[in-house]
């Protein structure tokens, strides 16, 4: 069955939001255990956007960000991005590595990431994303296999182009479920963006008996 | 201060005389900057994919290298640009993540976008006079309609003018 975003009703979007909540809740718990820190999250939002508008929803295309990206496949397929501002990413890495945090520098500070920091962030992203996908998998009964995580620090638009190009092959719009996490009292902010591919929506909704 | 016109992903626009066309954060996508110095008509396309063939949903011409160039040329010619004077500068086509796994279909999409862009420009007889492509980093570009210069900004890889 072919599915287009225009056919998604309010009920369908609510279901996707609920699934996002379950996934994000599980991800927040795992991260909190790993870092021994309090994690706050907002209620996930489901957004549908044209490609040329997506940057204005997530921030300017040339904003410097750190991101962990992975793809998942199995009964449903898609892309996940975990995006942080660079200062939060630096602090998150030092939290895991037990190194000294940098509280002096400004948000726009850029000094690149060491291989060790990059790999720490890949691992944090991996744990977050896997817990998220695990929860969705148990809830829907669908098998989901995540790929290896990849780290990059660059312009938001450039990082987003990777999952969006995949979308571009089937659609002019993209649907994503976005959750924001706040880590500890240091107010490290991050966006967690899940973009299932277009065929996966009907599979998810069917598995829950919604369509 | 010059007026700045933003071109989004899978989008294209043209201006004439003065002003700046910009597209922010090009990753694997390619920015195609066309310019006719005699009439000062400037056009910028931000393409995502090499080819519209074999893709069912292909009505957004700005999304594909093979269809965006033709559409941008039409718009520019409506603004009195003269095709024989139009030249091209291209930027982007990076590979943002170094995939270690099995050959993904996304592998080298940046490179394929660049090749398809050059091929399409050749078919339209538009010479590519400058190019800043490849690598593993993003680019923000600005095309100045006043002089046709293309400013390429990166994070950590310098700024250049093409």
Task: Please report, for each region that a protein language model flagged, where it lies by residue.
Chain A
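Composition-driven recognition of glycine/serine/threonine/acidic- and proline-rich low-complexity segments
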Residues: 2-26, 30-211
């Amino acid at each position: 069955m072919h599915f287009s975003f225009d056919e998604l009703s309010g009920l369908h979007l609510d279901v996707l939001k609920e699934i996002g909540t379950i996934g994000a809740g599980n991800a927040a718990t795992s991260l909190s255990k790993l870092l021994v820190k309090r994690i706050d999250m907002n209620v996930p939002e489901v957004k549908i956007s044209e490609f040329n508008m997506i940057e204005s929803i997530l921030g300017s295309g040339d904003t410097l960000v750190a991101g962990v990206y992975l793809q998942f496949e199995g009964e449903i397929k898609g892309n996940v991005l975990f995006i942080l501002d660079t200062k939060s990413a630096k602090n998150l890495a030092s939290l895991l590595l037990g190194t000294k945090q940098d509280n002096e520098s400004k948000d726009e500070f850029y000094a690149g990431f060491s291989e060790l920091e990059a790999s720490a962030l890949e691992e944090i992203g991996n744990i977050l994303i896997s817990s998220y996908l695990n929860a969705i998998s148990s809830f829907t009964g669908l098998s989901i296999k995540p790929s290896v995580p990849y780290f990059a620090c660059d312009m938001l638009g450039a990082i987003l182009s990777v999952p969006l190009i995949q979308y571009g092959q089937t659609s002019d719009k993209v649907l994503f479920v976005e959750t924001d996490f706040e880590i500890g009292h240091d107010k490290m902010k991050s966006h967690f963006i899940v973009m299932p591919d277009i065929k996966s929506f009907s599979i998810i909704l069917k598995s829950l008996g919604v369509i | 201060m010059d007026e700045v016109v933003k071109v989004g992903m899978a989008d294209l626009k043209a201006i004439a005389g003065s002003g700046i066309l910009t597209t922010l954060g090009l990753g694997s996508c390619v920015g195609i900057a066309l310019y006719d110095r005699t009439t000062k008509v400037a056009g910028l396309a931000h393409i995502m994919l090499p080819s519209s063939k074999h893709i069912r949903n292909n009505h957004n011409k700005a999304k594909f290298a093979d269809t965006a160039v033709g559409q941008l040329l039409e718009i520019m010619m409506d603004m009195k640009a003269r095709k024989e004077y139009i030249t091209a500068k291209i930027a982007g086509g990076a590979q943002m993540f170094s995939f270690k796994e099995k050959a993904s279909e996304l592998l080298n999409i940046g490179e394929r976008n660049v090749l398809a862009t050059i091929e399409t420009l050749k078919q339209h007889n538009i010479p590519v006079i400058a190019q800043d492509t490849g690598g593993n980093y993003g680019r923000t570009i600005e095309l100045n309609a006043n002089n046709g210069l293309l400013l390429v900004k990166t994070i950590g890889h310098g700024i250049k003018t093409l």
